[in-house]
Amino acid sequence: MTSKRALLRMQRSWAVSQGLTPDTRGYLAEVAANLFRPLSARALAAFEEGGGAELKDRPSAPAKLKALHSSAALAVNFFDYWIDRDCAPLLEALGIHGSLRAPLEIEGKLPIGLTGNPPNLDVLLELNSRALIGIESKFTEWLSRKRPSRVLFKPKYFEGGVELWSRSGLPRCQSLVADLVSGKEIYRMLDVSQLLKHALGLAVNSRHAFSLYYLYFDVPCPASKTHNEELRVFGDRVGDELRFVPLTYQELFRRLSASNRADGDYLSYLESRYFSS
């Protein structure tokens, strides 16, 4: 059994233990059944503004947030709890110094002036210093190898020969973009093009410092070695420019649990759902 299948089986076992009945694809009947608590008003509005695919069933598939393997559901279960609470314990667990200027955002939107919708960050924080912290969440996605033939960047990112990343103070990122497009550099497990788009959004929308977090659910397996090596290579190339912070959900949960400043029901839910062996 592959590591991804083992992870999906773990989620299915959790659902059954809660009296839930996932379908053959791992989707629950209702979004609420997949969450620690109902979506906050702010998170609900953010998902609705994003087109509704996370919340509404489609002809081809149920709403994405119904999936036991949903990365968005994982992020919501970790972060939406803090949207109306003192976030000091969360910031401490993330290694962030300072306090929030505004409530954290689920599905943070960072327009960059191009046509179409920019990719949403799973979580967006703005500190009192005006620094922006973007968090990209991954659950099972990184366990699937990326297709070499896929289009990494749409033509709009290069119209008129403008170097968007360099113009936004990210010359190392611009160099990496060029190497990706030419095929000089290839990443098999890490979705580097998505991270570079998020970095551009943060740079365009922040007049002060910003940082990009890559928060992922680690699974010991051969793919993890490749993934971690690609994280190292990416960090070596552009990490300083982005203040890039890779962090596992396992480590974040460990830090939150050790702080003794989070609600017991919240921690118990996360432990039984994601971290019980």
Predicted regions and their residues:
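Active-site cores of enzymes that catalyze phosphoryl transfer or operate on phosphate-rich substrates
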Residues: 132, 154-173, 262-277
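Nuclease-adjacent, charged terminal/linker segments that flank catalytic cores
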Residues: 1-111
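Non-catalytic C-terminal interaction segments of nucleic acid-processing enzymes
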Residues: 12, 188, 195-277
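A short, conserved, highly charged catalytic patch centered on acidic carboxylates
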Residues: 123, 138-149
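Short, solvent-exposed loop/turn segments at secondary-structure junctions
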Residues: 109-114, 138-142, 202, 217-221
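Active-site beta-strand-loop-beta-strand hairpin of nuclease catalytic cores
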Residues: 124-134, 203-208
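Active-site metal-binding core of divalent-cation-utilizing nuclease and nuclease-like domains
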Residues: 100-128
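Acidic, metal/cofactor-coordinating or nucleic-acid-engaging core segments within structured domains
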Residues: 144-212
